[in-house]
Amino acid sequence: METRKEIIKQMGDEMREDIFLEVNNRIERSLRRRFWLRISAVAASVTLLFGISNYISFHEGYKKLNSQMIEMVNPMGMRSSVVLSDGTKVILNAGTTLSYPAAFVSGQREVKVNGEAFFEVSHDKEHPFIVSAENVKVKVLGTKFNVKAYDDDDNIEVTLAEGKVGVGLDTKNLIQIMPGQQIKYMKASHRFIKREVRLQSYTAWVCGKFYFTNYPLEKIAKQLERSFNVRIQILGDDLRKAAFTGDFVRGENIDQILRVMTANRPIRYEIEGDQITISKTLLSKEIFP
């Protein structure tokens, strides 16, 4: 039978062991707490850095997205329109390419056009709107105007419908025009001509119409080629230079237009698919008697 001393000693050993285990557990819990606090701090730092990195990347991507140029190509035989990020509406004629940013940034509003386009520019006094057509610049604040600048044309024409625009080879030295006026830039001589025009003759295409006033046939043929996606061959220099006047409304096809143009004139035309040939009648010596 155990003596009192042995029992007391055994209890003391057990108490010391319990006390040791408790102290050890507390130390381990403290160490674990410190460890997880450090891990949490590191994780928080990584999360913060990741968040900042994502924020920077997002905004860099946003700028890249907004500065990215969009090229809109309108095929032959069609008209189309687009509304830019500032609210400006652009109507594209057949065979026209418009280059513009996804969104205007840094206060710059500039687009490029190759072909023909009618602009309805959203007014912004602080940020002028600039159209580049080859080496010609058109600068406006808010207005309606037409730009015709096809690669195969000899001239670039800017015709004003409303407001006021400036036209030049840069954005500083500009020629100002008023509604009903046109600036014609002659590519060969690098000269500008300012003149009064019949506005409908240069903007009717927006509504699908044609207004020709003493237009040479070769110029009319180019418009018809683009609008109807056909090829027109004119036989004879005198016929190419012959002037025509006429108005044609929406819905008339190429055959109807040519029929009206050649009526009561010593001219005939033949249509084979998308190929059209215009020539003088065999017995005619002059285009117009």
Task: Briefly describe each language-model feature range.
Residues L21, N25-I27, W36-V42, L49-P289:
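A residue-level detector for the "anchor" residue at the start of short, highly conserved motifs
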